[in-house]
Amino acid sequence: MRSFNSFRQESCSDATSSSGRIRTKSKSLSVVSLFISGVLLAPVSMAADEAKPATDATKSANQALMKELPFDDKTGFELAHKGFIAPLPQEQIKGEQGNLVWDPAKYGFIKEDQAAPDTVNPSLWRQSQLINISGLFQVTDGIYQVRNQDLSNMTIVEGKEGITIFDPLISTETAKVALDLYFQHRPKKPVVAVIYTHSHVDHYGGVRGVVDEADVKSGKVKIYAPVGFMEAAVAENVMAGTAMSRRASYMYGNLLPPSATGQVGAGLGTTTSAGTVTLIPPTDIITKTGETKVIDGLTYEFMYAPGSEAPSEMLFYIKEKKAINTAEDSTHTLHNTYSLRGAKIRDPLAWSKYLNEAIHMWGDDADVMFAMHHWPVWGKGEIVKHLKSQRDLYRFINDETLRMANQGKTMVEIAEDFKLPDALNTYFSNRGYYGSINHNVKATYVLYLGWFIGNPATLHTLPPVDAAKRYVDMMGGTDALLKKAKEYYDKGEYRWVAEVVNHAVFADPSNQAAKNMQADALEQLGYQAESGPWRNFYLTGAKELREGVNKLPVPDTASPDTVKAMSLELFFDYLAMRLDSEKADGKKIVLNFDFTDQKEKYLLEMENGVLNHTLGAEDKEANASVSLARTTLDALMLKQVTLEDALEKGDIKITGDQEKLTELLSYLDNFDFWFNIVTP
């Protein structure tokens, strides 16, 4: 899963020069971090009477899937139950402030022996049943997993002197409870190592719940990660953080109640915890495939897999245990080569080649394969079969998309016509519970050919509102459009209704009748969706069409670890992205920055509505020079000190025209998290 951080920095303004100090309207330079999809947002329930039942068309579509897939195959359930030791504690997990972090009973309505409701795709329901097989499990001798204590699994390996933990979940609170559960059933040995398999927050955020940083600094605990981990963990989504976070509140269904007409999980796991996110930098970096490390008496061979499921990722094999850890590159779902929250597109061809490499490196020797989501696979033959199937799945997406593109088909046409070979299509672990064939194919097209399909009619289309008004006019007005759309709705053509009625909504967002019809269509599409994120997008869209956007408080909970890990280069890039070019047009500001504790200097130049920075440069004619320690910058971003106080204490020294710093900050844009998605 994908981690992300959105930072919002409050601008400072209204300087007064008489005192020679900068006075600020906002009392601090603040940063807000939102990790994966509004994890910190408490779910808001829809009123029970707003969710409508499944229509006959939806029931029929879901029943048809029952005939397409081998639902009588119970292998997945046997694997998910294997090695069970103890259930999860059923008490709610709360943070220091009494905030709800994790509710293990939240998805209790999903029963293993219960048929899918009419309002849930039966294949997604099956996946959610499997994910909800929770607790502490033995993978093999000396390897244990805690599953469904968060979005991801936490793995514990017993070594010579202590234990090694793989991927300590999202939050310190959930990670601590997971470790406590393990200790209730196994000897209480010290944690001697942590392995981060990749750079997404559900694989490192709870680290301070299982180890003390003092032990890391003293050398008692080592932390292993792939090269580029820190850069990717902090930077992957900073620049588009607000947009990604808002869209991810749709993707993970954070605004939906868990229910048969609401959220049933994300396909990769149930949902995200809402606790304290931390990050301790790794002590040991894995740089290449074939690199080996002896960790607490066990031999690990690593495969470096950058640009697969994450920018920085690694798989590995534990020789003495004959165990492959595939990180998140091979689980029990088709993963995302593009995340609907928004992200850079991942390369399915490279992904396929990494899995092929894993087969040839370890397939002849492994007795068990496990990942950081879902349940393991046991037995050489079954492991190789699974890896080959997923290898071929990603390779087929790449190759078939390009084959059809070279026939002249467009992105949407390819996604519509795309068919997997039957052996790949009917293997449950290849189904699109998290990713989907449709949106992964579209992503692959864009990866190679970009957004333009080649038809000049689509080269410079009107923006949504302008186009919508003209569509409605050409269709004879909103009433005529809705009347005709209702006929299509009654025939079960919900995709077409959603496409057409969207024009009515964007032409006149005050028309509740149009929004209600659009919501009804999206809701039925959600009930039919096999992908958890698709279902969540559809149902959240329906909710906001009916109710409007509920602007919940966005908590100011910047993670100190993440802020401290943010490079100065990234910090200045982020400031530049926030520059409001209209406000800054025609203005010129030049500032020298000297970070005394890091012995780094930066030159900031604002001109032409752009903010550039240069490491190691200095301008003697600059408007002002600013001197401070990096620790002071961190304290400002975390709101531990105000800009005015830092100036008064001498933690920040400014020579030259002090008001120019305030002027620059006044040009920085602030972003509203709750921007509209399903309305203009």
Regions found by a protein language model. Name each.
Residues 52-62, 66, 323, 333, ...:
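Divalent-metal (often Zn2+) His-rich catalytic cores of metallo-beta-lactamase-fold enzymes
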Residues 161-162, 172-222:
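Active-site metal-binding motif and surrounding structural segment of the metallo-beta-lactamase
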